[in-house]
Amino acid sequence: GSEDADIIKNDSYRDKIKNKRYYAGAKGIGRFSCDRLGKRLILTTKTSDSETCEQINVNWSKFEEDQHNEFVNINVDYSQIPYNLEVFPDKSTHGTILDIKPLNSTWDREKLKGLKHSLEKLINPVSNTDDFSIEIICEREFEEDRSVDKFDNPKYIDRDRINGVIKNSILDILNLKTTQIDVQITKDEILTTVIDRGDNIYKIREINRKYPLLDDVKISLFYLNRTAKVNFTRRMGIEPVNYGSIFLFKNGFRVYPFGNKGDDSWGLDYRAQQGHSRFLGTRDLFGKVEINTNNNFQFKEVSSRDGGLVE
């Protein structure tokens, strides 16, 4: 359609951005994809010790006028604006705001619900840190959210509300209903714990001789028996197979496409097909692999947001 045509049309300047390898964290600036959402971007940012806010105003149409013009040669509007307590939420003295407008498409309730469901998968369900939270605020949906709360119907669940802080409560649902294997890998040792419906079965502590590059890895795997699948579907409003399988997080952020519906980046389904009753596939397992590392060279993500890690 026309949207796909626009994407193809604009690929050239996006590719130039990616190839420059200007990283925002472990990603290129193309990761933000603001131009796909709207026609303009107003970025406002301030440090805690600054007295003013820095602001840039980007008109994406300027990048499309001449595909041969390098993006570094295209001017964007820059200004400094006075700071006041109303600039950032909760009267914060620092922060960054990305204001995208006008939007390229209409965001109705169903689209916002899909956004919420996608964002909850970005939240590491077993992270012990509170570095940040994601909250959706959409005033026009307040009344409908209140109506959803009044329904005494299992069809309407917490995930159907648009407004509020996004949480990933998957592991709370599964914790006491199935068999779980937890693995912690440090530079010196590997600690494996088997838990069955909340009870510790056994622990194994081994010397880490095989994985010198892994010094802070946590793995949680859950076996999806029938009870776990039924409970998951009832609480989440979606079957586990359609939600995803084993997700990968690097330094607290999710790495795509690991865990996506139909994705076999872990090779589970391939191995399961090699023999009967010998291996578990993505339909049978749910969980996460969490890697914390400063070694971005060995665990570098590809420039595409859904390309996984560089092999």
Predicted feature descriptions by range:
Residues 73-78, 112-120, 151-153, 263-264, ...:
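Short intrinsically disordered coil segments
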Residues 86-238:
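Glycine/threonine-rich ATP-lid/beta-loop region of ATP-binding domains
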Residues 194-311:
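Charged regulatory segments coupled to nucleotide-binding catalytic modules in large multidomain enzymes
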Residues 21-22, 29-31, 81-88, 123, ...:
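Catalytic micro-motifs at enzyme active sites that drive phosphoryl/nucleotidyl and oxygen chemistry
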Residues 58-66, 151-161, 260-264:
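A short, sequence-level motif marking secondary-structure junctions
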Residues 1-102, 108-109:
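GHKL (Bergerat-fold) ATPase N-terminal catalytic module, capturing the glycine-rich phosphate-binding loop
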Residues 2-3, 40, 44, 122-125, ...:
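Conserved, well-folded catalytic cores of nucleic-acid-processing
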Residues 28, 36-39, 92-94, 129-130, ...:
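Short, well-ordered loop/turn elements at secondary-structure boundaries
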